[in-house]
Structure formats: C-alpha cells, structure tokens
C-alpha cells in the first residue's frame, strides 16, 4: 500500500522516515510550504517522494493510506476528489505514530496526557509518582529521561506534536546505545534501555500507545482545521487507550456518548 503523509511542518518528516524504515512505500506533501532543506535531503535519502500538489494523486492506483494531522484544513472528500478511484484509508498523525510503535512499550507502563490546560503540570506530577520507574518524558518543557533520580535533558526545544513521541524514544535509544549505527539498522551496542516507564504529553489528542490516557479538561473548546473541527473532537482520541482518566465535566459535556470499560472520571 502507498502512504501519503500530509503536513511536513508538524512531525510529518519523522513519520515519513519512520514508515520508510519499516519498509513502507511513502510519499509526502508539504501543504504549508515550510520544508527545510535539511529535511528535504533526509526525505530524499530515505526515498520518500514529494508531491507538488494533491492533484498528483491522479496518477496513483490501488490503495492509498492518507496520514494527516487532526488540524488539517482539508476534509477527506477534498482529498479524495483528486482521484475518486483510489481505495482510501485515513489515519491521523496520532494513529500513525501508534502503528509505528506497535512493537514498543508492551513491557512498561505508559501514560499519555492531553487536554486544553494542565497538561505539563500533570506530566510532572506523574513523574514524581513514577520516579522510581525511571520515566522517559515528552512535555512542552522538553524530552527528558530520569535515571535513578537524575534528570537527563534529551532535547529542550521540542514540540508536543505526536511524531515527537517517536523522536523522544529515538533520543533515549541513542543515549543508551552510543555506538550503534541506527541509520543503517546495525546495532553494535547492547541495545540497553535506561527507562522503565514513559509519560508523553501530546497536543490535540493521544496516539493510543499509552496504557492510560489522561484528559485534563476541555476548558476551552476552540476551533481547529479552519473551523471544520474542535479541540473536543480531536481530544476524543484519548478513548483509544485501554484505560482513561477524564475530567468529569469534560466527559459529561462532550463525551457522554462514549462507552469505555476502562473509563474513570475525576
């Protein structure tokens, strides 16, 4: 199946390269025209082909998986009209990250945090609770690894776009395996892992890789995707986690239609 990753501004480059490393056939579309030359060179090095415009889909055949951010200002109909004969599957960036990480994290507790306010403070309260488990953290304050109580800054200036969950995991891998050749897939180190838990803050929903999804609140249900969607609709993805902790006011107002066996409200 062909994969088309839309939006190379908010983590699409990482998603494209990660899919390519898994042997997928990947195309990418820089909808905002912000692709940096270094990122373009990386995509070219991995064999990711860039589309000039969605009208290029007219030359495609068969199945096509569209991977898009939840704030994309295009509907599925607006995309598929470029070639109505294709068999489309649509995945959010969040869902794509979960698929990319399908073989990661089964043996450790993982918490994903989303919401309008209180995400970062919730992450660091959870860090204090889980500190004995050497948590790996992605938050708006950076990608951080805690090892025996010692804070290791992996990257300071990193956004909480879902693709940076994979980036944070990769950064921690490099710390644990300094002599490995990741790009070639040849590991010379011992493939050690320095963390025993993970806490990931994510904007506009969660990937579903977490054992627990925490929704702090919907204090403001702002519009996204050029008013075609809202914050509450995007953050509905929290219910993809097997266990969910959701602020009761948010649940009652926006998600009362959701039946989830692992739901707890607060």
Language-model features: locations:
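Flexible, charged surface loops at secondary-structure boundaries
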Residues: 1, 20-21, 44-45, 57-64, ...
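Short, hydrophobic beta-strand segments that form beta-sheet elements in well-ordered domains
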Residues: 5, 25-30, 50-51, 65-68, ...
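Active-site regions of enzymes building and remodeling cell-envelope glycoconjugates
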Residues: 23-26, 39-53, 80-91, 135, ...
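Residues in the short beta-alpha loop(s) of Rossmann-like NAD(P)-binding domains
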Residues: 32-34, 141, 250
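Walker A (P-loop) phosphate-binding motif
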Residues: 97-143, 149-150
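Conserved nucleotide-sensing/catalytic segment adjacent to the nucleotide-binding pocket
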Residues: 149-211, 215
């Amino acid at each position: 199946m062909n994969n088309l990753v839309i939006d190379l501004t908010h983590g699409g480059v990482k998603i494209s390269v990660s899919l390519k490393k898994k042997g997928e056939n990947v195309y990418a579309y820089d909808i905002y025209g912000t692709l940096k030359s270094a990122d373009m060179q990386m995509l070219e090095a991995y064999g990711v082909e860039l589309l000039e415009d969605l009208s290029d889909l007219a030359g495609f055949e068969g199945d096509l998986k569209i991977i898009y951010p939840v704030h994309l200002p295009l509907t599925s109909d607006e995309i598929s009209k470029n070639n109505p004969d294709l068999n489309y599957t649509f995945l959010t960036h969040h869902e794509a990250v979960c698929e990319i990480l399908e073989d990661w994290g089964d043996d450790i507790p993982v918490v994903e945090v989303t919401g309008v306010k209180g995400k970062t403070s919730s992450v660091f309260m959870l860090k204090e609770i889980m500190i004995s488990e050497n948590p790996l953290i992605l938050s708006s304050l950076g990608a951080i690894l805690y090892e025996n109580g010692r804070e290791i800054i992996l990257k300071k200036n990193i956004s909480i776009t879902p693709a940076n969950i994979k980036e944070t995991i990769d950064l921690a891998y490099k710390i644990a395996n300094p002599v490995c050749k990741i790009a070639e897939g040849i590991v010379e180190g011992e493939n050690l892992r320095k963390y025993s838990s993970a806490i990931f803050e994510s904007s506009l929903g969660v990937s579903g890789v977490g054992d627990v999804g925490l929704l702090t609140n919907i204090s403001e249900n702002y519009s996204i995707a050029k008013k075609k969607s809202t914050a509450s609709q995007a953050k509905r993805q929290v219910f993809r986690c097997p266990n969910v902790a959701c602020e009761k006011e948010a649940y009652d107002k926006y998600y009362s239609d959701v039946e989830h066996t692992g739901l707890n409200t607060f």
